[in-house]
Every structure is written in structure tokens, then in C-alpha cells.
A protein has these predicted regions:
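Alpha-helical segment proximal to the catalytic Tyr-Lys
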Residues: 123, 168-169, 238
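Catalytic Tyr-X3-Lys loop
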Residues: 96-116, 135, 159
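Conserved mid-core segment of classical short-chain dehydrogenase/reductases
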Residues: 66, 89-104, 148-151, 190
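Short, small/polar-rich loop/turn modules that mediate ligand/substrate recognition or access, typified
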Residues: 171, 176, 240-242
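Active-site helix of classical SDR
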Residues: 118, 155, 163
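Conserved glycine-rich cofactor-binding loop
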Residues: 16-17
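Residue(s) in the substrate-gating loop at a strand-loop-helix junction
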Residues: 139
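C-terminal substrate-recognition "lid" of short-chain dehydrogenase/reductases
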Residues: 218-247, 252-253
Length: 255
């Protein structure tokens, strides 16, 4: 039996580390060709083999993104799927102390760049033989925001609304868009040992207790999120669009 995504191409943003890198691995394992883009130069060596192309790109630079998109399409011949994972989470500042420039920077990465990406990739998804698919990496903060995360929470909520609108606008093309809402994925760049220790102490927990502080008592990894992202592009979810699926072990505020 041929791999599920053999002959198909996925574009993954923020693909040099964390959830994005795990997505590269999950899609490659299913026979997919992968275009990985990231601001980090290590993206060019995130994976090896003829089915992977890593390209350095600041997704907030519209012209650079268009150039990179064209490079990827010329290399593999098209794009069937996209995983929107790139995002930033500065955090820590209450709204009363939040600089306008920081607010705008978070929105430029988490929302505006994704609008451009989706708009530019739309004609390619329309041509996908098995219909185009998009998975948006959202956040628990969409339904359960936290103090000190105004820009992040608001930008992810706006991105989620964009997904819902596009699910309606692109449904007639057979294009499916769905969002995954992870929480506390600790093997990503933002969770340094220092941050982990600090947050655990804030809640009066050990680091291990903090990592599994959810209804199921499990730790959620980048691979967990990536595997579901890949599955949502597959036949199992062929009749699902505009869904929002938590990947958080069960967060009591979300539930």
C-alpha cells in the first residue's frame, strides 16, 4: 500500500523547531514532500532527502514570502496542504504596560502574515487533485486567555476567525481548514528551563507536576500535535472543516 500522502506537497511554516519540525517529520513519514520555511537558517537542514526543501523566510516580508513560495512550487510542482505554525509569544506584559509596537509585531506575525500566506496559496490549493487542506496551529488561549498574553491571545483568536471565514468561502472548492489548539507544549523554543521553573513555582508545583497539569495528567509533545495535524489532512477527516480540536490533555478552563 502506498503512503497516504505520496505525490502530495505540504508547506509548513515555523518548521525549524518544535511543532513545526515535528510536522515536517510526520508528513514525511506519510510519503509527503515538504517545503519547510522559517526565519532560522537551520531550516535548510531540518531534514534530509529529496522529499524535503528548507527555505529561509521572514513570513512578515510579503515579497520574500512570494519569492519563497514560487521557489517551492517550482521545485515540487505545486502545494496540496499547508500547516500554519509560525508564531511568536512575547508575553509577560499586562495591557496597561503593553507597547503598541509589541502589539503590532505579534499581530504582524501571528495574523497578518498568515492572511498573506493563505491568500497567495489559495490558487494552488484549488488545483490540488485531492482538494486543498490547511491546518492552523491555534492555542488554548483562544478560548481561555491568560493575563499577560493579550497580544498573543487576541492574535490567535483573530487567526481562528479567519480560518472559520475561509472554511465558508473556500468550501465550494472542496478546501478544508481546521484549527488545533495546543496548550503547554514544553519541547518548544519558548519553554526554556528558566521559564518552566518560574511558571511551576508560580503555581506551587514541581516542573514535572506542571508539565502534566491537565485532566488526563499527561505531557503534550510537539509530536502529539504534529501527528494530529497530519491526520487532519488525511482521509479520516475528509468531511471535516472549520473544526477546532484541543490538544491539551484536557484543560479545565477550556472544558
Amino acid at each position: 500500500k502506498a503512503p497516504e500522502f505520496q505525490g502530495e506537497v505540504v508547506l509548513v511554516t515555523g518548521a525549524a523547531s518544535g511543532i513545526g519540525k515535528a510536522c515536517v517529520e510526520s508528513f514525511l513519514a506519510r510519503g509527503c514532500a515538504v517545503i519547510g520555511i522559517d526565519l532560522d537558517n537551520s531550516i535548510t537542514s531540518t531534514s534530509s532527502g529529496s522529499n524535503y526543501l528548507g527555505l529561509v523566510c521572514d513570513i512578515t516580508n510579503e515579497n520574500k514570502f512570494k519569492e519563497v513560495l514560487e521557489t517551492g512550487v517550482r521545485y515540487f510542482g505545486g502545494i496540496d496542504m499547508v500547516v500554519l505554525n509560525a508564531g511568536i509569544f512575547p508575553g509577560g506584559k499586562k495591557v496597561s504596560e503593553l507597547p503598541t509596537d509589541e502589539w503590532r509585531k505579534v499581530f504582524s506575525v501571528n495574523l497578518d502574515a498568515n492572511l498573506v500566506l493563505l491568500r497567495e496559496i489559495y490558487p494552488l490549493l484549488q488545483l490540488a487533485p485531492n482538494k486543498g487542506r490547511a491546518v492552523i496551529i491555534g492555542s488554548k488561549n483562544v478560548s481561555a486567555p491568560g493575563p499577560g498574553a493579550a497580544a498573543y491571545s487576541a492574535s490567535k483568536a483573530a487567526l481562528n476567525q479567519l480560518m472559520r471565514v475561509l472554511a465558508m468561502e473556500w468550501g465550494s472548492d472542496g478546501i478544508r481548514l481546521n484549527t488545533l489548539h495546543p496548550n503547554a507544549v514544553f519541547d518548544t523554543a519558548i519553554w526554556t528551563d528558566e521559564v518552566l521553573t518560574s511558571r511551576a513555582k508560580h503555581y506551587g508545583l514541581s516542573v514535572n507536576e506542571y508539565k502534566t497539569n491537565n485532566v488526563l495528567g499527561v505531557e503534550v509533545s510537539s509530536k502529539d500535535v504534529a501527528e494530529l495535524a497530519a491526520e487532519m489532512c488525511g482521509s479520516l477527516f475528509a468531511k471535516t472543516t472549520a473544526a477546532q480540536v484541543p490538544v491539551d490533555g484536557g484543560n479545565d478552563r477550556v472544558i
